[in-house]
Each structure stands twice: as C-alpha cells, then as structure tokens.
Amino acid sequence: MALEICVKAAVGAPDHLGDCPFSQRALLTLEEKSLTYKIHLINLSDKPQWFLDISPQGKVPVLKIDDKWVTDSDVIVGILEEKYPDPPLKTPAEFASVGSNIFGTFGTFLKSKDSNDGSEHALLVELEALENHLKSHDGPFIAGERVSAVDLSLAPKLYHLQVALGHFKSWSVPESFPHVHNYMKTLFSLDSFEKTKTEEKYVISGWAPKVNP
C-alpha cells in the first residue's frame, strides 16, 4: 500500500510544492528511503474539509501509513525509521541537536526591523557553532560520511535561510564559515533535495507576509 503525504502548496500557486521546511523534511526522508508515496498539495489558506478531518489543527505534513494519518514531522520521521530501517537515517544522540537553533534565530533576524537588536549576532553564533562542529568532525554530514535525520531536518531550513535572507536583506552566510558553505552545497546537491525543494520564488512568497505583515 503506497504511502500518502499531505504537504503545503505554494502561496498563490496551489499546484506547486510550497515552502514548508517541515514538509520537505518528511519528503526527504521518504526519498532517502526510496519509498513510493502519493503527494497531496494542501492550500493552507483554503483547507479542504477532508484535510481538516485528518488534521484538525490544519497543520502539515501529515502522513498516511498503515491506514492511519500521522501529524508532526518528528513523529513521521520516527515512524518511517522504525518501519523502514534500511537505509538507516537515525542520527547518533550526541549529534541530534546540532544546528537546532538555526531556524529560530534565522526567523527572528529575517523579521527584525532593528539592526541593533542582536538578532543577526544570535544567528551568527548558531552558524559559528555549526561551523565548529563541521570543522572538528569528519563529514561531509553532521554525523560523518552518511546523511542522517539531522541533515534532512537542517537542509530545508538552510535553504530558506539562504533564499529568504538573500532576497529580503541582501544577506548571506559569511565566507568565514567555509565548512557551512560546503555543507550547504552538499545538502542542496542531493538528488532527494533536488526532487523535493520548492522553487525560490515560492520560498519568497511564503515568507513575504511574515516579513512585511
């Protein structure tokens, strides 16, 4: 029985994959495990009733597995790892939280209108921590030679960071973080990433209402 997954449709383009990094994380996991799945694009500004019936809070992603609909990307990734253990994607516990604060600090900086509020510095601190991890461990991924769950969580978030900050703030990751640059290049060149990424213009249209409410 094929798996089914509900993910965000693009803002203003409901027939295209949208800009939800948590949806892409789930799709990346499905792709890395070479699983067959059917995708449902959900227009989050006009949610169909059948979707609200399976996801009362109206959140994506939602995965149908064993005739049950499961919400939350953390839960989805855990279930897929348990049911389809090959190839293994579980990240060793000591590396599982690497980069976990990047997305939050990115969002704060992106929406900031005050250049002196410390939000840029907070993001740079997190990127420096990622740089130091990558520098002190054999890569190219967080946990070594093989891609794992932490990479699949970070990849969409770093893509959003690159696209949105480049567009709205003309900002990019400093060249003083060469390992982060190489890591992003490695992630973005994965076949699974190419297949599941949204177009840059939809990342921008997705963030626009949050940047300029």
Swiss-Prot record:
Tissue specificity annotation: Expressed at least in roots and leaves.
Binding site for glutathione: K8, D19, K47, V60, S73, H160, W207
Family of this protein: Belongs to the GST superfamily. DHAR family.
Disulfide bonds: none
Organism: Arabidopsis thaliana (Mouse-ear cress)
Induction context: Induced by jasmonic acid (JA), oxidative chemical stresses (e.g. norflurazon, menadione, paraquat, and antimycin A), and during photosynthetic operation in the light. Also up-regulated by insects such as Pieris rapae in a JA-dependent manner.
One GO term of the biological process aspect: L-ascorbic acid metabolic process
Catalytic residues, chain numbering: C20 (nucleophile)
Residue span(s) of domain GST C-terminal: 84-213
Residue ranges constituting the GST N-terminal domain according to the UniProt record: 10-83
Protein name as annotated: Glutathione S-transferase DHAR1, mitochondrial
GO cellular component: apoplast; chloroplast; chloroplast stroma; cytosol; mitochondrion; monoatomic ion channel complex; nucleus; peroxisome
Outcome of substituting C6S: Reduced activity by 50 percent
Annotated gene: DHAR1
Main location group: mitochondrion
Chemical reaction(s) catalysed: RX + glutathione = an S-substituted glutathione + a halide anion + H(+); L-dehydroascorbate + 2 glutathione = glutathione disulfide + L-ascorbate
Cited function: Displays a dual function. As a soluble protein, exhibits glutathione-dependent thiol transferase and dehydroascorbate (DHA) reductase activities. Key component of the ascorbate recycling system. Involved in the redox homeostasis, especially in scavenging of ROS under oxidative stresses, subsequently to biotic or abiotic inducers. As a peripheral membrane protein, could also function as voltage-gated ion channel.
The entry's keywords: Cytoplasm, Detoxification, Glutathionylation, Ion channel, Ion transport, Membrane, Mitochondrion, Oxidoreductase, Peroxisome, Plant defense, Stress response, Transferase, Transport, Voltage-gated channel
